[in-house]
Structure formats: structure tokens, C-alpha cells
UniProtKB/Swiss-Prot annotation:
HAMAP family: DnaJ. It is found in: Cytoplasm. Gene3D superfamilies: DnaJ domain, Heat shock protein DnaJ, cysteine-rich domain, Urease metallochaperone UreE, N-terminal domain. A zinc finger (CR-type) spans 132-214. Participates actively in the response to hyperosmotic and heat shock by preventing the aggregation of stress-denatured proteins and by disaggregating proteins, also in an autonomous, DnaK-independent fashion. Unfolded proteins bind initially to DnaJ; upon interaction with the DnaJ-bound protein, DnaK hydrolyzes its bound ATP, resulting in the formation of a stable complex. GrpE releases ADP from DnaK; ATP binding to DnaK triggers the release of the substrate protein, thus completing the reaction cycle. Belongs to the DnaJ family. It comes from Clostridium botulinum (strain Eklund 17B / Type B). Zn(2+) 2 binds at C162, C165, C188, C191. CXXCXGXG motif repeats lie at residues 145-152, 162-169, 188-195, 202-209. This is Chaperone protein DnaJ. GO terms for molecular function: ATP binding; heat shock protein binding; unfolded protein binding; zinc ion binding. The J domain is necessary and sufficient to stimulate DnaK ATPase activity. Zinc center 1 plays an important role in the autonomous, DnaK-independent chaperone activity of DnaJ. Zinc center 2 is essential for interaction with DnaK and for DnaJ activity. The lineage of its organism: Bacteria, Bacillati, Bacillota, Clostridia, Eubacteriales.
Length: 373
């Protein structure tokens, strides 16, 4: 690696600390490892340079000499014909485990496998969501085969240990590369990673251990749920394999809107219409709530759009105590198509209030009372 700057190879500045050198090497070793870049000669050369640079910069004595005299003193001293030569990979075994099968990237498939979760959407009416309801749902899920008790083998027969992988579910393959000998681990093709061979598969589940079943499940939905809420039913999902735990069933709630009420959190809103005269004089109205009708006194002088609160008449708080409130919005209706008597009354009301009339209003009044005479 003639005239190469080892610090530059690792993406570092001269004088970098030991910790910085280790971190840089770790990152680059993963990126350019030959097993991750099969057939890529450029990556292979880059990997070789990275290791050569690390051999020097990770050794205090070599690093000191390099800092004083440069890389020329170490050219050709990196890798011998035996692969990595004297390079010490101590402390970096976890990097190479992912390529050699020693780390967590290789999964064993002969142990218990947990079942998958299931999601099911339930649509409720507004009232069902407010008061709570019991719903029967139908779920299609994978369950342990009763015929073979989930073993996958026909009753009266048994499994045998896979002779290829000796029951581990994995096989190790040694390969020679320009950088030396590498051992990789892969799933055993003969037993598909289970570690066992089923000589006579179960006639019901065909050796799988699980079968599809349609089940009816009663779900108790509490009062106060709303659209977007999710209820977990533990252990009601897909069954596991080889003794694995079952998954969960998640009930996603969807609530149909009400024609009369609007819901915001645990509060309910409703509009009620009253006449202009009742708004001015005050009146008693009947208000519909989710629990039935109640009486409410609207005070005189109420303006259109005014909100009145009915405390505790809202929706129950899920898994808690108390309820929200109901808000009543008063809409004051302005009359249309007034008859002569109604108009006269309004003109009289305007005069009683001391309101000034513009020319058009005065003209209408004159014509109106003129016709009366």
C-alpha cells in the first residue's frame, strides 16, 4: 500500500485516539468484508488496506514509528500468504461473527416459534361505543393440530434427528478466499432448520404441526371506546410451533358517527333550535342526551351559538371513573316570511327599544300601517 496514509484509509486525522481508531476500523470492516461483498474485488482490496492500516495504528510501537517515519517502513508487511498473517482480531470477533455464523444473525429454527398476532376491526354504533357491548367475532387462525398434538408426525410414529446437521438445524461450510479460510453457517436444507426429520408426516396438518381453524370469540368492549382504540386479547392470536407461545388478537375499534351527537374525546355536543322570542324572553327546553331526555332552562337574552354544559352527561372514561360532559349549543332561528301581524309587532318592538329606522324601514312601516287603515 505504497504512499498510503493509514489515518486517511480509516477516515481519521493524524493523532486519533485508540478508541477512535477501533471505532473507525469496526465500521469499515463491516462495510467492506468480503462475505458481504462477494465477487467485488474492489471491496476485497479495500478490506485488505483497512486491516493493514489497523495492524499498524493499533500497535503502540508501530504507530509511534509510523507517526515519525511514514508508511514506507511498513509497506508489504500487512498480509502474508496465510491470509491475515499476524493480525490480531481480538476484541472484534463480533464483527466477523455475522459472516462466520458465530453471532446472532444466524437463526436456529429447531426451537419454539411464537405465533403471529392477529388484528381484527370491529365497527360499533355510536350508542354501543358509549355504553359498551359484547360482540361475537369470527377469526380464522392457525392452531396446534389436535391429531398429532402439534408434533407434525403421524400418531404412532416419531421424528428422528437430522443426520446432516446432527439436530442443530445448521450446517457449517468452510470456504477459501484470498484473505484466508472462512467458515459460514447456513440453515440445513434437509430438515429446513428444524433439526428433525419427520418420516411419516401427519395426515391432518401435513407435517406442519398447525392447522387453520375458524373460531367464534366473544369480546367484551367497555363503555367509552372510540375510533382508533385497540384492545389486546392476550393469547388469542395464531398458535406457536414446537411449544412456542400463541400470539395476541388485537381488536381495532371503529365507531359509526351519530346523526344527532358529535363526540370530542369524552364530551358530547348537540345543537338545539329555539325561536328569537324564546331566546329573548328565556324558556325551558327538552334536551336529548345519550341517557334520555332532560329539561334545561335557557336564560333570557341567550345569543345564538351559546354553549350550555350538562355535567356528567358525556361518555364514560375507559378503565377509569367519571364521565365527560354534554354541551348544548343554542341556535336562535330568525323567522322568514313574516305576516302583517308579525311585522307590526316587530316594528312596535323596535320603537319600544328606541331603535332608529332608516328610510327603507320607515317606508315599509308606513305602507304596512297604511294598509291596515
Amino acid at each position: 500500500m505504497a504512499n498510503k496514509d493509514y489515518y486517511e484509509v480509516l477516515g481519521l486525522q493524524k493523532g486519533a485516539s485508540d478508541d477512535e481508531i477501533k471505532k473507525a476500523f469496526r465500521k469499515l470492516a463491516i462495510k467492506y468484508h468480503p462475505d458481504k461483498n462477494k465477487g467485488n474485488t474492489e471491496a476485497e482490496e479495500k478490506f485488505k488496506e483497512i486491516n493493514e492500516a489497523y495492524q499498524v495504528l493499533s500497535d503502540p510501537e508501530k504507530k509511534s514509528n509510523y507517526d515519525q517515519f511514514g508508511s514506507a517502513d511498513f509497506n508489504g508487511g500487512g498480509f502474508g500468504s496465510g491470509g491475515f498473517g499476524g493480525f490480531d482480531m481480538g476484541g472484534f470477533g463480533d464483527i466477523f461473527d455475522m459472516f462466520t455464523g458465530g453471532g446472532s444473525s444466524t437463526r436456529r429454527r429447531n426451537g419454539p416459534v411464537n405465533g403471529n398476532d392477529i388484528e381484527y376491526t370491529v365497527t360499533l354504533t355510536f350508542e354501543e361505543a358509549v355504553f359498551g357491548v359484547e360482540k361475537e367475532i369470527t377469526v380464522n387462525r392457525s392452531e396446534s393440530c389436535e391429531h398429532c398434538n402439534g408434533s407434525g408426525a403421524e400418531p404412532g410414529t416419531s421424528k428422528k434427528t437430522c443426520p446432516t446437521c446432527s439436530g442443530t438445524g445448521q450446517v457449517r461450510v468452510q470456504r477459501q478466499t484470498p484473505l484466508g479460510s472462512f467458515v459460514s453457517t447456513s440453515t440445513c436444507d434437509r430438515c429446513s432448520g428444524t433439526g428433525n426429520i419427520i418420516e411419516k408426516p401427519c395426515t391432518h396438518c401435513r407435517g406442519n404441526g398447525n392447522v387453520r381453524k375458524t373460531r367464534k370469540i366473544n369480546v367484551n368492549i367497555p363503555a367509552g371506546v372510540d375510533t382508533g382504540n385497540v384492545m389486546p386479547l392476550r393469547g388469542q392470536g395464531e398458535h406457536g410451533l414446537r411449544g412456542g407461545s400463541p400470539g395476541d388478537l388485537y381488536i381495532r375499534i371503529n365507531v359509526s358517527p351519530s346523526k344527532e351527537f358529535t363526540r370530542k374525546g369524552n364530551d358530547i355536543y348537540i345543537d338545539t333550535h329555539i325561536s328569537m322570542a324564546k331566546a329573548a324572553l328565556g324558556t325551558e327546553i327538552t334536551v336529548k342526551t345519550v341517557e334520555g331526555n332532560v329539561k334545561y332552562t335557557v336564560p333570557e337574552g341567550t345569543q345564538s351559538g351559546t354553549l350550555f354544559r350538562l355535567k356528567g352527561k358525556g361518555v364514560a372514561r375507559v378503565n377509569s371513573t367519571g364521565k365527560g360532559d354534554q354541551y348544548v349549543r343554542v341556535i336562535v332561528d330568525i323567522p322568514k316570511g313574516l305576516n302583517q301581524k308579525q311585522k307590526e309587532a316587530l316594528y312596535t318592538f323596535m320603537e319600544a327599544c328606541g331603535e332608529e329606522m332608516d328610510e327603507n324601514t320607515h317606508s315599509f312601516k308606513k305602507n304596512l300601517f297604511g294598509r291596515k287603515k
